[in-house]
């Protein structure tokens, strides 16, 4: 079930280095340029408490189950304190990661994915985005981009998921493809390997078609 509020809830998903954060922010800016009230947010995060949980999950070693429970707590806080209030005001909420990332990162198989979905339905009132865009890139390109990003940031603060090997990134890429098959009406996959401007144009095309708007490029 998608959200039943006035505004629209759009999420961006993808592997580390896919360009999803860049594309989500570009869409947010495009909405504002077109006179549409919008806010940008991210997971794990979006509220003071959720941001504290983010630092714990991204930089501390723990079991997948512990990660899952912390993320669910952060998401509940995020939905109740930020996402739903903004949607109720008629704003579009653009979010960098949501439930689909949890399905890919915090599960090992389809059975665990179903458990996560059951928790999501019971604890989070079956709250799903109106539309999800998965930005796909190959694991090798993802790892190249992670290295370039870190050089430009001039910092050693790679999180534990950035630091994983190519086999891990391949697993996440495959998981996103599988998750997209679970929600074909909600999820659209986009090739994230072309130039940023070309990917952004594809995002705008999809938003115009799916959300019945006419965003000017």
Swiss-Prot record:
Keywords carried by this UniProt record: ATP-binding, Kinase, Nucleotide biosynthesis, Nucleotide-binding, Transferase
Top-level division of the source organism's lineage: Bacteria
InterPro entries: P-loop_NTPase, Thymidylate_kin-like_dom, Thymidylate_kin_CS, Thymidylate_kinase
One of the Pfam families matching this protein, by short name: Thymidylate_kin
The reaction(s) this protein catalyses: dTMP + ATP = dTDP + ADP
Binding site for ATP: 14-21
GO molecular function: ATP binding; dTMP kinase activity
SUPFAM superfamilies attached to this UniProt entry: P-loop containing nucleoside triphosphate hydrolases
EC number, UniProt record: 2.7.4.9
GO CC terms: cytosol
UniProt GO BP: dTDP biosynthetic process; dTTP biosynthetic process; dUDP biosynthetic process
Similarity-based family: Belongs to the thymidylate kinase family.
NCBIfam families on file: DTMP_kinase
Biological role stated in the UniProt entry: Phosphorylation of dTMP to form dTDP in both de novo and salvage pathways of dTTP synthesis.
Database matches in PANTHER family: THYMIDYLATE KINASE (PTHR10344), UMP-CMP KINASE 2, MITOCHONDRIAL (PTHR10344:SF4)
The protein's name: Thymidylate kinase
Source species: Orientia tsutsugamushi (strain Boryong) (Rickettsia tsutsugamushi)
Lineage: Bacteria, Pseudomonadati, Pseudomonadota, Alphaproteobacteria, Rickettsiales
Gene from which this protein is expressed: tmk
